[in-house]
Amino acid sequence: MQNNLISHINLRNFRNYEYQSISFTDGLNLIRGDNGQGKTNLAEAIYFLSGFGSHRTYKNQPLIKSGEQKAEISAKIQSKYGTRNVYIGISCNSNNILKVDGKPSKLRDLVSVFSCVIFSPEDIDLVKGDPGHRRKYLDDIICRARPMMLDIYSAYDRTLKQRNSLLKSFRKSSCKSDLLDIWTQKLVELGLEIVNARKRLLKILNPKISEFYSKLAGVSSTAELFCQSSDCLIDTFDLLRDREIEEGVTLAGPHRDNVDILLNSCPARSQSSQGESWTLALSMKLSLIELMRETKRLYDPDPVVILDDVFAHLDSYRKQKLAQEVFSYEQTIVTTTDNSDNYRTSQTLVVEEGKVFSENKKG
């Protein structure tokens, strides 16, 4: 095994898995099975180890097997520092428990231990969904490159909740405006760090998105993310104060910035075809991987790449182009329902009703 690979995972009461122990190899790991058997659940569990949660839900309850109170994911990660043991306990009634090598850890510790990128049917929301999907895409990249930024985002969220609570209290009774000014100033300071981080990222990200789009589509095109944010947040809050007090909510800041994606200068969300939208979404994910590969300080050398039932949504040309990009990575995990796919695999696994079996095939 080489750097940053998952060699083993144990699942207990995760989704439809009661208990399952699964080993992986480097190269291409193919996971076959009919719909509803647990392929996506397995992909989700692997991605969960990267510190960015589930790509399907923000809630813990759906992750826990029906009738149980807790789910567990544990894994062995092969890194340049040797084998790292990662554990995540997922609970209905309390915060998740995170451990690295047996020691209590934070999310940023997971980000530094295991890097993983997942391609899934939900990726179409990067193009067709609301701006929140694209904001999260940018913010996840920022936190991957600089795990300490997780603290900035957490502080921003806490400050936002405090400010919203204060705004609501204005509606019920007269509160001191200087207290609102204090929370506003704190929100502006944290928000500015996020806005500037996004601007720096877009400068290096957009050329990559255009390059990958042109490669996947087979035609020269310009694709770019465009972020509309306030140039002076403190002035914006002054203008919005009366309205914010009336509505009891913060109406400006990076959590509300409009992030749009343009294809040849046209808004892709409303004007791109299904094929163009998928190509854009894939280009965004491939650009993320390229950035991670360039950040040798953290990712040495490749992230683990998961393709969860993505090929089923692509035509043969785009499928071939995507395969050329990702099958050369150190470790790729592909789920599929198609038994006719003839990939050169290091390992083929079959999933049936929450049980995983090895076909012991070598490509």
From Swiss-Prot:
Classification via InterPro entries: DNA-binding_RecF, DNA-binding_RecF_CS, P-loop_NTPase, RecF/RecN/SMC_N, RecF_2
Alphabetized Pfam families for the sequence: SMC_N (PF02463)
Keyword DNA-binding in record: yes
Subcellular location as annotated: Cytoplasm
Positions that bind ATP: G33, D34, N35, G36, Q37, G38, K39, T40
Keyword presence, Cytoplasm: yes
GO cellular component labels: cytoplasm
Key words of the record: ATP-binding, Cytoplasm, DNA damage, DNA repair, DNA replication, DNA-binding, Nucleotide-binding, SOS response
Main localisation: cytoplasm
GO MF, one example: ATP binding
Biological-process GO terms, alphabetical: DNA replication; DNA synthesis involved in DNA repair; double-strand break repair; SOS response
Family designation: Belongs to the RecF family.
The protein's role, per its UniProt record: The RecF protein is involved in DNA metabolism; it is required for DNA replication and normal SOS inducibility. RecF binds preferentially to single-stranded, linear DNA. It also seems to bind ATP.
NCBIfam families: recf (TIGR00611)
Record-given protein name: DNA replication and repair protein RecF
